[in-house]
């Protein structure tokens, strides 16, 4: 029995399912989840001392690679001054200034401790600002595990094969209107019917929780136009795309400006951080300035601020995102070539340093139905073959993959060699 198998058996005694986030349980791909004990650069090492090229990156935050020395040094330095104060710090202001400089739509920002907190708070703020109750989200998009957003969500819920979560009251769900992603005509029709009741539209500008689905041409622009027409707050959930698709996020990459944005993952540099922000006239409705309440004991935690500030400064260097995107493109081109050579139906998607892998004969992946039409069983086999070859992919056919600046030619060769063997075995 492997060390991971032993640890997983022990974990299930007191942790539901043996994991603290459902997708980690390997239910979608089968087998025993790997328990990791070390991570450095582009690699993670499991409890049995096997090393893998990592394309999960802690589900997105590790854009610099694991254990970047500058980030570790910043955290060590802060450790000497204390773990948490529950009071304002200079670093919070530095972080707010930097985020607002990088993302021009962010005129004011509030720090929280997770992406879920960020999206939950942004929606409450939009409701308080507009005085309206309903929200629009998109099928397959995941915005955290708050009650009103677990309606036809993506991510772990797609992995489990259920459209929503038990425990969500119907009274909550009735205010959440769900439309097809990349279908601007459906948005226009809905807003023409009930726009006066809609507080906000929340969208992942790149749908990264039903694998990786970029926006169709005109979709984001159409959302902006429709929100302006009906007085609806447009929220970009950039927890995944922020600082990754481009330094300024998907809104910079696609040239569409939201009213509010949410960020997470990279902003914490591996520590638990999220934030939401946007137009000053909206943000001034947050307590203590306004009537919309939001608070958090660990919001702006100094250790997290130290890690996040260092990360954002490092990724701000000229050429960083071009290098990240180039590696990702070479990776996907190499995978496609090897799948084609093996006669395996396969298509990839990309947005900067995030990507999607689909076992599908479709020309492109644009809609939720396109995602669901891919062969999850073939992915399951591919996942385990790649794992045997020393490559760790997301353990679900419905999760995006991530590259880091630590991935280089050696990691690319190892990955493509493993993929060539895996595709051959799938014939």
UniProtKB/Swiss-Prot annotation:
One of its GO terms (biological process) is protoporphyrinogen IX biosynthetic process. It catalyses: (S)-4-amino-5-oxopentanoate = 5-aminolevulinate. Its EC number is 5.4.3.8. It comes from the Bacteria. Keywords: Cytoplasm, Isomerase, Porphyrin biosynthesis, Pyridoxal phosphate. NCBIfam families: hemL (TIGR00713), PRK00062.1 (NF000818). This is Glutamate-1-semialdehyde 2,1-aminomutase. The lineage of its organism: Bacteria, Pseudomonadati, Pseudomonadota, Gammaproteobacteria, Pseudomonadales.
């Amino acid at each position: 029995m492997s060390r991971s198998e032993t640890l997983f058996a022990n974990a299930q005694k007191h942790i539901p399912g043996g994991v603290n986030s459902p997708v980690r349980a390997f239910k979608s791909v089968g087998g025993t989840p790997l328990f990791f004990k070390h991570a450095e650069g582009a690699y993670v090492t499991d409890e049995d001392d096997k090393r893998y090229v990592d394309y999960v990156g802690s589900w997105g935050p590790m854009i610099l690679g694991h254990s970047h020395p500058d980030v570790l040094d910043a955290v060590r330095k802060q450790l000497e001054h204390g773990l948490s104060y529950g009071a304002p710090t200079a670093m919070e202001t530095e972080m707010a200034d930097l985020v607002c400089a990088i993302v021009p739509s962010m005129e004011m920002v509030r720090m929280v401790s997770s992406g879920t907190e960020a999206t939950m708070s942004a929606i409450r703020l939009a409701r308080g600002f507009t005085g309206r109750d309903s929200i629009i989200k998109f099928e397959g998009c995941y915005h955290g595990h708050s009650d009103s957003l677990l309606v036809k969500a993506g991510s772990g819920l797609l992995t489990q094969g259920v459209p929503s979560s038990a425990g969500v009251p119907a009274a909550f769900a009735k205010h959440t209107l769900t439309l097809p992603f990349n279908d601007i005509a459906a948005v226009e029709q809905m807003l023409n019917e009930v726009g006066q009741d809609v507080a906000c539209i929340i969208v992942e500008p790149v749908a990264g929780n039903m694998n990786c689905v970029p926006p169709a041409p005109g979709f984001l622009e159409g959302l902006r136009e429709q929100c302006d027409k009906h007085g609806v707050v447009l929220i970009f959930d950039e927890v995944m795309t922020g600082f990754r698709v481009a330094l300024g996020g998907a809104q910079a990459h696609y040239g569409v400006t939201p009213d509010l944005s949410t960020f997470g993952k990279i902003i914490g540099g591996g520590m638990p951080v999220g934030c939401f922000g946007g137009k000053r006239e909206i943000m001034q409705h947050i307590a203590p300035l306004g009537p919309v309440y939001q608070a958090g004991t660990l919001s702006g935690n100094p250790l997290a601020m130290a890690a996040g500030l260092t990360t954002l400064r490092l990724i701000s260097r000229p050429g960083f995102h071009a290098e990240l995107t180039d590696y990702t493109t070479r990776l996907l081109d190499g995978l496609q070539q090897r799948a084609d050579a093996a006669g395996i139906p396969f298509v990839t998607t990309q947005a900067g340093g995030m990507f999607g892998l689909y076992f599908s004969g479709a020309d492109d992946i644009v809609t939720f139905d396109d995602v669901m039409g891919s062969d999850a069983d073939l992915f399951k086999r591919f996942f385990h073959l790649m794992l045997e070859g020393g490559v760790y992919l997301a353990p679900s056919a419905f999760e995006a993959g991530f590259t880091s600046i630590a991935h280089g030619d050696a990691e690319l060769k190892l990955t493509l060699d493993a993929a060539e063997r895996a595709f051959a075995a799938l014939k």
